[in-house]
């Protein structure tokens, strides 16, 4: 392996060793301020479409909820409980029986 030539003037002038990466020693680049107007306009169009589809989905969801509520009214109550539609009539019958006694 050949030996390096050492010059005193060259060593004194460079304080940083050569093996250090230029990327590490360089200052970070400033952030870009400009944005491209074409991409911004394209994003606006796509966001408008997304808003419209969300609105349509919301309407369908509300319609589905109303339909579900209507079907739930027709079905018997959950957990094996019965509806209390007949209970007011039975209360009246009990009151009449109590009066007749």
Curated annotation (Swiss-Prot):
One Pfam family matching this protein: HMG14_17
Source organism: Bos taurus
Gene from which this protein is expressed: HMGN1
Function: Binds to the inner side of the nucleosomal DNA thus altering the interaction between the DNA and the histone octamer. May be involved in the process which maintains transcribable genes in a unique chromatin conformation. Inhibits the phosphorylation of nucleosomal histones H3 and H2A by RPS6KA5/MSK1 and RPS6KA3/RSK2.
Keyword Nucleotide-binding assigned: no
Protein name: Non-histone chromosomal protein HMG-14
Ranges of compositional bias, category Basic and acidic residues: 33-51, 70-86
InterPro entries found in the cross-reference section: HMGN_fam (IPR000079)
Domain of life: Eukaryota
């Amino acid at each position: 392996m050949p030996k390096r030539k050492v010059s005193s003037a060259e060593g004194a002038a460079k304080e940083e060793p050569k093996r250090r990466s230029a990327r590490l020693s360089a200052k970070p680049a400033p952030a870009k301020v400009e944005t491209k107007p074409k991409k911004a306009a394209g994003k606006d169009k796509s966001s408008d479409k997304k808003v419209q589809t969300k609105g349509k989905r919301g309407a369908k969801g509300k319609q589905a909820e109303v339909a579900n509520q209507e079907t739930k009214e027709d079905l018997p109550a959950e957990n094996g409980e019965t509806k209390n539609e007949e209970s007011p009539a039975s209360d009246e019958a009990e009151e009449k029986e109590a009066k007749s006694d």
